[in-house]
Structures are given as structure tokens and as C-alpha cells.
């Protein structure tokens, strides 16, 4: 019984000291935009053994502009997030000009794009993004709801 009380006390302390990821702050990236503004997915050739073989692919440039004015001088991590939706999974792979980190994520995931002290009121970069989907892509138009989250240290 005494052991059980210690376990309950330890769990209670763990809940009080929850990591910062438990409450990420969504950042305003409403000034970000894609070039071109609308992208059409293209069919990939059928090649057995390759992921997304026979699926769809598109390339887009994203001019990223994140409002960080409330966090200037604070240390933390910024993640790019792609929520899962009801349609087929999307894989996004990107390179950057250097302010943000290159990376990869799939629907329902988030990926680290910045670590350190927030340098100014905006965080800007340009991403070259490859989007891929399986052949079950079923829509002529679909809005992808990428966004950015900040976790403060």
C-alpha cells in the first residue's frame, strides 16, 4: 500500500511538471503564401517497390512569414504542423533558404523547423515543398491546413 502511495505521488508530480509541448502556441502565419497560389497534383509513374508509386505529386514554393512579435528574445522550438483530415495522407518534404530547417512530415504529424532564441518580430524563409499522396487522392481541390506552433523553453 505504501508503494502504491509513492507511485501515485510520483504520477501527481509528473503531471504538475508537464513538458512545454503540452501547451504549444499557434503562431500567426497568415502573411505566408504559395507560388503559384493553387497547385495541381500530377500522377506519378507506376514503379513497383517505391512509396507513392502511381500516386500524385506537386511542387510548390512557400514564402513563409511567421508573426513572432510576442516571443522576441524567448528561447523555444517552432514546429510545422499538418493535421490529419478525412482525405488521403499527404507527405510533405521541403528545403529552405536557411532560416528554417529542411524536413519531412506526413498528415497528422509535426516537424521541427526552428530551435533557438526568436530573433525578431517576424521569422521569414522560403520553402520548396514536394507534396505526395497515394493514388486514393479523390478531390479536384483540397486545402491543406499547414500551420506553425511554438513551444517556449
Task: Indicate where each model-derived feature is located.
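Bacterial N-terminal signal peptides that target proteins for export
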Residues: 1-8
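Generic, low-specificity signal for short hydrophobic/alpha-helical stretches with a mild N-terminal bias
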Residues: 4, 60, 109-115, 128
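Hydrophobic transmembrane signal anchors and adjacent membrane-proximal interface regions, especially
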Residues: 7, 29, 41, 57-58, ...
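N-terminal signal peptide c-region/cleavage motif recognized by signal peptidases
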Residues: 17-19
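N-terminal small/polar-rich segments of proteins
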Residues: 21-87, 120-137, 141-143, 147-153
